[in-house]
């Protein structure tokens, strides 16, 4: 069993047995019913990417291609415009969060990256002093939240650090997430930020190191318990999924494309499970 599958099953069991019920929940299902959930707090996982440990489950198929395209929308295009995500990348799942027919998700994610010129600043800091301890991407912007409506960022902060081991520089990353739909989005969010970590490492010709993942509120919605039990019954596939970025070292961050990524040795259990999302 891969490390990701072990952690996935452990967290599902913990939420079902030890989780508590949400109160005054904000999300709604499409039928208008309040989307309550059982949740745990303070979930943490560590993956050593350099040793082939990647945060993707084999217990159900994960839409890794569309997930990675979202990273490009946020950190390369640096926009909140849904038309770009729809037309350039063919990704439409964000459309449910459109703000009042504006064609955007509000001043969130990519708009915040552009507003603060975050990517150029991070790359400049790492170039000038890789060992500085201030490499923080934060999408939490109270001014933007007051200015426009929209879903507040779930994965809102990632920090980077480097280590020199036997002459090689490794880039580590720590993702902090305020809220996470365990069954639907956990591995999508994790792999998105692994992809970002890989892009930055490749920009400098470094190796990818460790990926640390902290979720403050990890939950399973009340319409997902049947799927949760099915996932616990499934036997994981014996394989070692790993993401590769097929570009030369020191390829500029902004020249990397979604199709440069390839997920190898990934044979998830089928059929896919269906979920009614909470909006």
Swiss-Prot record:
Pfam families referenced in this protein's UniProt entry, alphabetically: Thymidylat_synt
PANTHER family (alphabetical): THYMIDYLATE SYNTHASE 1
Leader peptide range in chain numbering: none
Family per similarity comment: Belongs to the thymidylate synthase family. Bacterial-type ThyA subfamily.
Location, primary (coarse class): cytoplasm
Annotated binding of (6R)-5,10-methylene-5,6,7,8-tetrahydrofolate, by residue: 181, 278
GO-annotated cellular components: cytosol
Protein name: Thymidylate synthase
GO molecular function: thymidylate synthase activity
Subcellular location per the Swiss-Prot or TrEMBL entry: Cytoplasm
Pathway where it operates: Pyrimidine metabolism; dTTP biosynthesis
List of catalytic residues: 154 (nucleophile)
Function: Catalyzes the reductive methylation of 2'-deoxyuridine-5'-monophosphate (dUMP) to 2'-deoxythymidine-5'-monophosphate (dTMP) while utilizing 5,10-methylenetetrahydrofolate (mTHF) as the methyl donor and reductant in the reaction, yielding dihydrofolate (DHF) as a by-product. This enzymatic reaction provides an intracellular de novo source of dTMP, an essential precursor for DNA biosynthesis.
Catalytic activity: dUMP + (6R)-5,10-methylene-5,6,7,8-tetrahydrofolate = 7,8-dihydrofolate + dTMP
Enzyme Commission code(s) on record: 2.1.1.45
Subunit structure: Homodimer.
InterPro entries referenced in this protein's UniProt entry, alphabetically: Thymidate_synth/dCMP_Mease, Thymidate_synth/dCMP_Mease_dom, Thymidate_synth/dCMP_Mease_sf, Thymidylate_synthase, Thymidylate_synthase_AS
UniProt: dUMP binding residues: 133-134, 178-181, 189, 219-221
Entry keywords, A to Z: Cytoplasm, Methyltransferase, Nucleotide biosynthesis, Transferase
GO biological process annotation, one example: dTTP biosynthetic process
PROSITE patterns given in the database record: THYMIDYLATE_SYNTHASE
